[in-house]
UniProtKB/Swiss-Prot annotation:
It comes from Thermosynechococcus vestitus (strain NIES-2133 / IAM M-273 / BP-1). Pfam families: cobW (PF02492). It comes from the Bacteria. Coiled coil: none annotated. Keywords: Chaperone, Cytoplasm, GTP-binding, Nickel insertion, Nucleotide-binding. GTP binds at G11, P12, V13, G14, S15, G16, K17, T18. Its main location: cytoplasm. GO terms for biological process: urea catabolic process. GO terms for cellular component: cytoplasm. Belongs to the SIMIBI class G3E GTPase family. UreG subfamily. NCBIfam families: ureG (TIGR00101). It is found in: Cytoplasm. This is Urease accessory protein UreG.
Length: 200
Protein backbone atom coordinates (compact mmCIF):
# COMPACT_ATOMS: atom_id res chain seq x y z
CA UNK A 1 0.00 0.00 0.00
CA UNK A 2 1.49 3.33 -1.07
CA UNK A 3 1.73 6.18 1.39
CA UNK A 4 0.33 9.57 0.42
CA UNK A 5 1.81 12.58 2.20
CA UNK A 6 -1.03 14.75 3.50
CA UNK A 7 -0.07 18.37 4.09
CA UNK A 8 -2.42 20.72 5.93
CA UNK A 9 -2.29 24.41 5.05
CA UNK A 10 -3.94 26.65 7.66
CA UNK A 11 -3.99 30.29 8.68
CA UNK A 12 -6.21 33.35 9.08
CA UNK A 13 -8.50 34.62 6.31
CA UNK A 14 -6.54 36.41 3.58
CA UNK A 15 -3.09 35.30 4.73
CA UNK A 16 -2.26 33.59 1.42
CA UNK A 17 -3.19 29.92 1.96
CA UNK A 18 -4.78 29.49 -1.46
CA UNK A 19 -1.97 31.45 -3.15
CA UNK A 20 0.54 29.11 -1.49
CA UNK A 21 -1.33 25.95 -2.53
CA UNK A 22 -1.64 27.34 -6.08
CA UNK A 23 2.08 28.12 -6.32
CA UNK A 24 3.10 24.77 -4.81
CA UNK A 25 0.86 22.81 -7.18
CA UNK A 26 2.31 24.61 -10.20
CA UNK A 27 5.87 24.07 -8.97
CA UNK A 28 5.47 20.39 -8.03
CA UNK A 29 2.90 18.97 -10.48
CA UNK A 30 5.47 17.84 -13.06
CA UNK A 31 7.45 15.87 -10.45
CA UNK A 32 4.75 14.52 -8.14
CA UNK A 33 1.19 13.20 -8.37
CA UNK A 34 -0.92 15.78 -6.52
CA UNK A 35 -4.47 16.48 -5.37
CA UNK A 36 -6.09 19.21 -3.24
CA UNK A 37 -8.95 19.44 -0.76
CA UNK A 38 -10.11 22.96 0.11
CA UNK A 39 -12.43 24.02 2.95
CA UNK A 40 -14.85 26.94 2.83
CA UNK A 41 -17.81 27.54 5.12
CA UNK A 42 -20.60 28.09 2.57
CA UNK A 43 -18.94 28.15 -0.87
CA UNK A 44 -16.28 26.42 -2.92
CA UNK A 45 -14.50 29.71 -3.60
CA UNK A 46 -10.95 28.45 -2.97
CA UNK A 47 -11.46 25.29 -5.05
CA UNK A 48 -12.88 27.40 -7.89
CA UNK A 49 -9.89 29.77 -7.72
CA UNK A 50 -7.48 26.83 -8.05
CA UNK A 51 -9.47 25.45 -11.00
CA UNK A 52 -9.51 28.85 -12.77
CA UNK A 53 -5.81 29.24 -12.09
CA UNK A 54 -5.21 25.76 -13.57
CA UNK A 55 -3.16 24.72 -10.55
CA UNK A 56 -4.15 21.10 -11.30
CA UNK A 57 -6.73 19.40 -13.52
CA UNK A 58 -10.16 20.27 -12.02
CA UNK A 59 -10.98 16.67 -11.09
CA UNK A 60 -7.97 16.65 -8.73
CA UNK A 61 -9.37 19.58 -6.70
CA UNK A 62 -12.24 18.92 -4.28
CA UNK A 63 -14.00 21.70 -2.40
CA UNK A 64 -15.57 20.85 0.96
CA UNK A 65 -18.33 23.11 2.29
CA UNK A 66 -18.01 22.86 6.06
CA UNK A 67 -21.23 24.74 6.86
CA UNK A 68 -19.92 25.97 10.21
CA UNK A 69 -16.76 26.64 12.16
CA UNK A 70 -13.80 25.88 9.88
CA UNK A 71 -11.83 24.61 12.88
CA UNK A 72 -14.30 21.78 13.54
CA UNK A 73 -13.91 20.35 10.01
CA UNK A 74 -10.15 19.93 10.39
CA UNK A 75 -10.02 18.94 14.05
CA UNK A 76 -13.01 17.70 16.07
CA UNK A 77 -14.98 16.19 13.18
CA UNK A 78 -12.72 15.71 10.20
CA UNK A 79 -15.09 13.23 8.50
CA UNK A 80 -15.89 15.48 5.50
CA UNK A 81 -12.20 16.00 4.81
CA UNK A 82 -11.33 12.35 5.37
CA UNK A 83 -14.06 11.36 2.89
CA UNK A 84 -12.73 13.85 0.32
CA UNK A 85 -9.19 12.52 0.76
CA UNK A 86 -10.42 8.94 0.36
CA UNK A 87 -12.30 9.92 -2.81
CA UNK A 88 -9.17 11.47 -4.33
CA UNK A 89 -6.92 8.60 -3.25
CA UNK A 90 -9.30 6.08 -4.83
CA UNK A 91 -9.77 8.03 -8.06
CA UNK A 92 -6.12 8.93 -8.65
CA UNK A 93 -4.15 6.14 -7.02
CA UNK A 94 -1.21 6.35 -6.69
CA UNK A 95 -0.84 9.88 -5.31
CA UNK A 96 2.30 11.35 -3.75
CA UNK A 97 0.85 14.40 -2.02
CA UNK A 98 -2.53 15.81 -1.03
CA UNK A 99 -2.85 19.39 0.18
CA UNK A 100 -5.69 20.02 2.65
CA UNK A 101 -6.38 23.75 2.86
CA UNK A 102 -8.41 24.78 5.89
CA UNK A 103 -10.97 27.53 5.88
CA UNK A 104 -9.67 30.84 7.23
CA UNK A 105 -9.46 30.58 11.01
CA UNK A 106 -7.81 32.05 14.07
CA UNK A 107 -4.39 31.40 15.59
CA UNK A 108 -5.76 28.48 17.63
CA UNK A 109 -6.60 26.33 14.58
CA UNK A 110 -4.91 22.94 14.39
CA UNK A 111 -5.36 19.88 12.20
CA UNK A 112 -6.32 16.48 13.55
CA UNK A 113 -3.29 14.15 13.41
CA UNK A 114 -5.50 11.58 11.67
CA UNK A 115 -6.14 14.07 8.86
CA UNK A 116 -2.65 15.34 7.95
CA UNK A 117 1.00 14.32 8.35
CA UNK A 118 2.47 17.84 8.19
CA UNK A 119 1.10 21.31 8.85
CA UNK A 120 2.08 24.54 7.13
CA UNK A 121 0.70 27.60 8.89
CA UNK A 122 0.46 30.87 6.93
CA UNK A 123 0.33 34.33 8.51
CA UNK A 124 0.79 37.67 6.80
CA UNK A 125 2.72 40.79 7.58
CA UNK A 126 -0.33 43.00 6.94
CA UNK A 127 -1.79 41.76 10.23
CA UNK A 128 1.13 43.44 12.03
CA UNK A 129 4.48 42.37 13.43
CA UNK A 130 2.84 41.32 16.71
CA UNK A 131 1.33 38.15 15.19
CA UNK A 132 4.26 35.75 15.84
CA UNK A 133 4.46 36.68 19.52
CA UNK A 134 0.71 36.16 19.98
CA UNK A 135 1.45 32.46 19.72
CA UNK A 136 -1.17 29.78 19.36
CA UNK A 137 -0.57 26.27 18.02
CA UNK A 138 -0.34 27.43 14.39
CA UNK A 139 2.60 29.67 15.28
CA UNK A 140 4.34 27.44 17.80
CA UNK A 141 3.64 23.86 16.68
CA UNK A 142 3.21 23.85 12.89
CA UNK A 143 5.88 21.97 10.98
CA UNK A 144 6.55 25.06 8.86
CA UNK A 145 5.49 28.66 9.49
CA UNK A 146 5.13 30.84 6.39
CA UNK A 147 5.21 34.60 7.00
CA UNK A 148 3.71 35.97 3.79
CA UNK A 149 3.36 39.40 2.16
CA UNK A 150 6.71 40.67 3.44
CA UNK A 151 6.57 43.32 0.70
CA UNK A 152 3.79 45.05 2.66
CA UNK A 153 5.91 45.61 5.79
CA UNK A 154 6.77 49.27 5.07
CA UNK A 155 3.13 50.09 4.30
CA UNK A 156 1.72 48.67 7.53
CA UNK A 157 4.55 49.68 9.85
CA UNK A 158 5.66 46.09 10.47
CA UNK A 159 9.27 45.37 11.38
CA UNK A 160 10.47 42.14 9.72
CA UNK A 161 13.41 41.85 12.12
CA UNK A 162 11.00 41.94 15.08
CA UNK A 163 8.90 39.26 13.38
CA UNK A 164 11.98 37.06 12.85
CA UNK A 165 13.10 37.51 16.46
CA UNK A 166 9.66 36.72 17.87
CA UNK A 167 9.26 33.75 15.53
CA UNK A 168 12.54 32.24 16.71
CA UNK A 169 11.50 32.84 20.32
CA UNK A 170 8.09 31.19 19.84
CA UNK A 171 9.20 28.31 17.57
CA UNK A 172 12.67 27.39 18.77
CA UNK A 173 14.28 25.27 16.06
CA UNK A 174 11.09 24.69 14.05
CA UNK A 175 11.53 26.13 10.55
CA UNK A 176 9.91 29.25 9.15
CA UNK A 177 10.05 31.03 5.78
CA UNK A 178 9.46 34.68 4.87
CA UNK A 179 7.62 34.93 1.54
CA UNK A 180 6.13 37.23 -1.03
CA UNK A 181 3.95 34.78 -2.93
CA UNK A 182 3.04 37.42 -5.53
CA UNK A 183 6.64 37.37 -6.79
CA UNK A 184 7.55 33.84 -5.66
CA UNK A 185 10.12 35.05 -3.12
CA UNK A 186 10.74 32.29 -0.55
CA UNK A 187 8.69 29.68 -2.42
CA UNK A 188 11.82 27.64 -3.14
CA UNK A 189 12.35 27.18 0.61
CA UNK A 190 8.80 25.85 1.06
CA UNK A 191 9.36 23.47 -1.87
CA UNK A 192 12.66 22.29 -0.35
CA UNK A 193 10.88 21.61 2.96
CA UNK A 194 8.22 19.49 1.22
CA UNK A 195 10.74 17.68 -0.98
CA UNK A 196 12.61 16.43 2.09
CA UNK A 197 9.39 14.96 3.50
CA UNK A 198 8.36 13.48 0.15
CA UNK A 199 11.70 11.69 -0.05
CA UNK A 200 11.40 10.27 3.49
Amino acid sequence: METVLRVGVAGPVGSGKTALVDALCKALRDRYRLAVVTNDIYTQEDAQFLVRSQALPPERILGVETGGCPHTAIREDASLNLAAIQQLETAFRPLDLIFVESGGDNLAATFSPELVDLTIYVIDVAAGDKIPRKGGPGITKSDLLVINKIDLAPYVGADLEVMKRDTLKMRGDRPYVMTNLKTGLGLDQVIAFLTVHLAA
